[in-house]
């Protein structure tokens, strides 16, 4: 990582009309994080000293996300959308503070790797004033071309202005630019708007720098890194690219994904060695899985920690605040939330365990419900170590079941149960012999 100080200006003022959404474009999520979050995290990994985020008018939600992810971010408002250079100059106060390098990124380009940004900055330390990121798409139609002579970047030519020879160039402009800070303001403030749209284009910085006798260069990125998101289709395409990266990283780290294309990970998902993930599993944000865990098909996890040797599913749902101790078994159609389940405990079938602590080696039978909400507040359930909860039982919180206690099947438990006690909370069974035969005789054969 460079020792040079770095100001990153993130442009997040676009309207995003093609998204057809009330949510600002840059707040749409990919792999569990907003696009803006992805970009800000990349700037952190790339060694940003300061970050300035340029937003549109009345976008307090975008400002809030920027400060949530990076509390020290400076936020500036571009009151009129008059082009990319105009947007960068909206952060003029940040540009006037000391820095070695300035990096301009777009909040709707969330897949850049930090090492790509470090490579883009490197020529600035060697004397270049401007460095532009390029890529080589399979079809360059529609992109601005990067025109080079040897190692020098001569110009960025928009396709509509390009000659036939220039259009044959396949090295295209990704829009990302690094500038040496001591020349940045001088260059940016001289960009004009003498074009058809009357806008100020950042791409003009290259020719202004060269006219000043300064050096401009281009570096290259992989095509998938510079994918911009302007529509729902492109959002899905970016999701697919990032999921591919995350799946490959998980498998390289020692996890088995039986059908990788059906497993969806969040950026912060952590899978240990010899974890087995069956098909159609979704990892929401905040999931950590230790070694030797088995996650059966069609399970959904979010905000959960699974210790070594856990088995969950199929069709399990782990919600935020779930922590499963070593060797815990969570079976099919079980939902947990804000639940601490200690080592060796079992919740095998058709149960809801919320706002609860289940002690080690306890057994929670099929159809057990912790009734944690009274319409106003949540309440906790405590199940002691080695307790046995019979099937189809309701534990009405706040309530405690002592260690080693038994709850009879079908019980509704409203009072605390002492350790090693048996609690029954159901009506007594009544048997009336011959009753069914008499009913059929009185009513005749049932109609189908």
Curated annotation (Swiss-Prot):
Named cofactor requirement(s): Mg(2+)
Region spans: Pyrophosphorylase: 1-232
Cofactor note (record): Binds 1 Mg(2+) ion per subunit.
Residues annotated to bind Mg(2+): 108, 230
Residue numbers spanned by region Linker: 233-253
Functional summary from the UniProt entry: Catalyzes the last two sequential reactions in the de novo biosynthetic pathway for UDP-N-acetylglucosamine (UDP-GlcNAc). The C-terminal domain catalyzes the transfer of acetyl group from acetyl coenzyme A to glucosamine-1-phosphate (GlcN-1-P) to produce N-acetylglucosamine-1-phosphate (GlcNAc-1-P), which is converted into UDP-GlcNAc by the transfer of uridine 5-monophosphate (from uridine 5-triphosphate), a reaction catalyzed by the N-terminal domain.
Designated name of the protein: Bifunctional protein GlmU
């Amino acid at each position: 990582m460079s020792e040079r100080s770095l100001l990153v200006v993130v442009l997040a003022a676009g309207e995003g009309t093609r998204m057809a959404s009330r949510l600002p474009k840059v707040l749409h999520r990919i792999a569990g994080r907003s696009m803006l979050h992805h970009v800000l995290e990349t700037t952190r990994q790339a060694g940003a000293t300061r970050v300035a985020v340029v937003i549109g008018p009345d976008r307090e939600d975008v400002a809030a996300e920027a400060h949530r992810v990076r509390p020290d971010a400076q936020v500036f408002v571009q009151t009129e959308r008059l082009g990319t250079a105009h947007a960068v100059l909206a952060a003029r106060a940040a540009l006037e503070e000391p820095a070695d390098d300035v990096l301009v990124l777009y909040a709707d380009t969330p897949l850049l790797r930090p090492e790509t940004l470090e490579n883009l900055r490197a020529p600035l330390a060697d004397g270049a004033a401007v460095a532009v990121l390029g890529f080589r798409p399979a079809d360059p139609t529609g992109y601005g071309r990067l025109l080079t002579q040897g190692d020098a970047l001569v110009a960025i030519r928009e396709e509509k202005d390009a000659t036939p020879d220039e259009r044959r160039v396949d090295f295209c402009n990704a829009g990302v630019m690094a500038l040496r800070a001591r020349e940045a303001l001088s260059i940016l403030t001289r960009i004009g708007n003498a074009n058809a749209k009357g806008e100020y284009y950042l791409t003009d910085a290259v020719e202004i720098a060269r006219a000043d006798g300064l050096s401009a260069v281009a570096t290259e990125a992989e095509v998938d890194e510079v994918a911009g998101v302007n529509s729902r289709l492109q959002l899905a395409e970016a999701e697919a690219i990032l999921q591919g990266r995350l799946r490959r990283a998980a498998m390289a780290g020692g996890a088995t994904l039986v059908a990788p294309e059906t497993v969806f990970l969040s950026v912060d998902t952590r899978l240990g060695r010899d974890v087995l993930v069956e098909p159609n599993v979704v990892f929401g944000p905040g999931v950590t899985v230790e070694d030797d865990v088995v996650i059966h098909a069609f399970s959904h996890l979010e905000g959960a920690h699974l210790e070594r040797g856990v088995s969950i599913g199929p069709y399990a749902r782990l919600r935020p605040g779930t922590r499963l101790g070593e060797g815990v078994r969570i079976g099919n159609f079980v939902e947990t939330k804000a639940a601490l389940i200690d080592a060796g405990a079992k919740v095998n079938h058709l149960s809801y365990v919320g706002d609860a602590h289940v002690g080690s080696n306890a057994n929670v039978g099929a159809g057990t419900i912790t009734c944690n909400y009274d319409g106003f507040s949540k309440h906790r359930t405590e199940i002691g170590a080695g307790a046995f909860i019979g099937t189809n039982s309701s534990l009405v919180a706040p309530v405690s079941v002592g260690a080693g206690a038994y709850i009879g099947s079908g019980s509704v438990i409203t009072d605390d149960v002492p350790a090693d006690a048996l609690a029954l909370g159901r009506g007594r069974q009544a048997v009336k012999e011959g009753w069914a035969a008499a009913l059929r005789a009185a009513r005749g054969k049932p109609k189908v």
